[in-house]
């Protein structure tokens, strides 16, 4: 890797040392060196090898600036994290006001904020939702979803789509594509995770009819897959199969939720009422890490029975 780092450093333009980050304490060159040495050398180098030498400095609204001053419109938005733009003034103001009195709290006790946010999520979700459990990221929220459907059904198998991605945490990673999990030996037990082709209703039924599947998890629009749109009626057909064979449907709305598709939740376009909705990214406003698992009374019955275990 040393030679690659050298090649990257050699590309930095003359005089770049004089360009400072925000408060003037760090140059772009120093930031590059730190990322290569202490953060993620492969990811950093890969983008530079493609000619994309961005080190993000200032960010505001739907734009950010490279440390060399070049302005970019952010159409990526971190998968919806910045639905409201970078450093949205209303979000910043709410957090600044909140930290005058609040901190992370205590996981044993309720609070005004937890109760109000849970109520807002439940009441704006699809019909039948009852509970909202909070996490710090989308992957963790998927883990909660998988734990919930396993508890509710007393089954263990999780079915997902080929080429899917649901997060880098343990259970979420095991439900994802081999590209993300196999290198880390997180493939999970084969008998508990299975993937089927997208839009293949027959393949889905072939797995579900064994009546040993706890949950089917599907991104309403599979993002890491390349944003293919499900064929009309596919998601509704999957939900019908879930109901037929006693399986719970998890809608991964981390990227498609919170109005990003024009409706509060992307699954609403399909006329499907899932048993679980997973939310994250944009829920944080891009400032405070928070995600949520929204569940029906059936899917979330552990909350009533063994709520202290989480």
Locations of the language-model features?
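Conserved N-terminal phosphate-binding loop of PLP-dependent enzymes in the Aspartate aminotransferase
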Residues: 3-310
